[in-house]
Structure formats: C-alpha cells, structure tokens
C-alpha cells in the first residue's frame, strides 16, 4: 500500500505541474522544442493519475461508492460556487 500511495502522491504533483505549465505557456503550446503540447502533457498526466485512482479502488484503499458520492458532492458545490456548470 505504501508504494501505491507514494506513486499516487507523485502523480498528483505531476498533474499540478502540468496545469501550471498550461497556464504559463498556453494549453496548446509547447515550452521546449520537440515536446508535445501542454494539452497532450496534461492528458497524459491525468491518465496516469486516473490509473492510480483506479488501483486505489481495486486494492480496497478507497471504496468506489464513496468516491462516486464524493464526485456528486463536489459537483453540487461547483454548481453553487463556480461557473463551471452554468450555460
């Protein structure tokens, strides 16, 4: 379990870094020659994070039903406190 949590933590940090670069350089730009776009990097990092989340569920570290409920709760908060769900 320790290895799984360590890698989960690392992937969270990599998503944070990818988001920062999207904001800094623009989502469809690359920040170095030969690198893909920030969007491509963000997509990869989110995929890596989702893999680790799925493993946490599969290994019983968290329950899928509890994660699903947390998602619904977050969506409800976003509808109140953000513009993300507004037309």
Task: Go through each PLM region and give its residues.
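Flexible "arm" and connector segments at domain edges
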Residues: 1-46, 50-87
């Amino acid at each position: 379990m320790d290895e799984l949590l360590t890698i989960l933590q690392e992937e969270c940090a990599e998503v944070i870094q990818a988001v920062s670069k999207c904001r800094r350089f623009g989502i469809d730009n690359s920040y170095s020659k030969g690198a893909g776009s920030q969007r491509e990097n963000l997509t990869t990092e989110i995929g890596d994070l989702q893999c680790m989340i799925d493993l946490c569920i599969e290994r019983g570290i968290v329950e899928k039903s509890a994660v699903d409920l947390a998602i619904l709760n977050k969506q409800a908060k976003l509808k109140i406190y953000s513009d993300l769900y507004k037309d």
